[in-house]
Amino acid sequence: MATSFCSSISMQAPFSATTTRFCLNKQATIFNNEKTNNLSFSLRRLMPARLAVSCAVKQETVEKVSEIVKKQLSLTDDQKVTAGTKFTELGADSLDTVEIVMGLEEEFGITMAEERAKEIATVQQAAELIEELVQEKTA
């Protein structure tokens, strides 16, 4: 998670005046070069921003992966599994993850390299890898 801060300095003249810009903490600040009556400083904290990056995978692939994960982990129908759900959040250990990968390979008719399979931690990551492998298989 990234947090950013903003600092600003402003001075105002009663009449129009030429201005000079400079950067303070990567924010543009304007100073008036003429006589000024007002000088103000303000610091404000900006809201933290979270970025999410994901590839466009078919919703049906995500749904199939979710179903297989629920089946392999013996989850009830009321337990929600979304694209961002981590296997560890569902109580899966490394053996469970291997079983999930085996179920995915069987369902989609693909073979995952062990190194690539170890990188899968979420439903989204599994769906992305599956679509990539299916494309490679058909190409």
From Swiss-Prot:
GO CC, alphabetical: chloroplast
Q: Which residues form the Carrier domain?
A: 59-134
Gene disruption: observed consequences: No visible phenotype under normal growth conditions.
User: Mind listing the GO biological process terms from this record?
Assistant: response to salt stress
**What span is annotated as transit peptide?**
1-54
PROSITE patterns registered for this protein in UniProt: CARRIER (PS50075), PHOSPHOPANTETHEINE (PS00012)
Which residues pair up as cystines?
A: none
Which sequence positions carry the modification called O-(pantetheine 4'-phosphoryl)serine?
A: S94
Q: Which InterPro entries match?
A: ACP (IPR003231), ACP-like_sf (IPR036736), ACP_chloroplastic (IPR044813), PKS_PP-bd (IPR020806), PP-bd_ACP (IPR009081), Ppantetheine_attach_site (IPR006162)
Molecular function GO terms recorded:
acyl carrier activity; phosphopantetheine binding
User: Which Gene3D superfamilies does UniProt cross-reference here?
Assistant: ACP-like
Please report which protein family the annotation says this sequence is part of: Belongs to the acyl carrier protein (ACP) family.
**Biological function:** Carrier of the growing fatty acid chain in fatty acid biosynthesis.
**What name does UniProt use for this protein?**
Acyl carrier protein 5, chloroplastic
What organism is the protein native to?
Answer: Arabidopsis thaliana
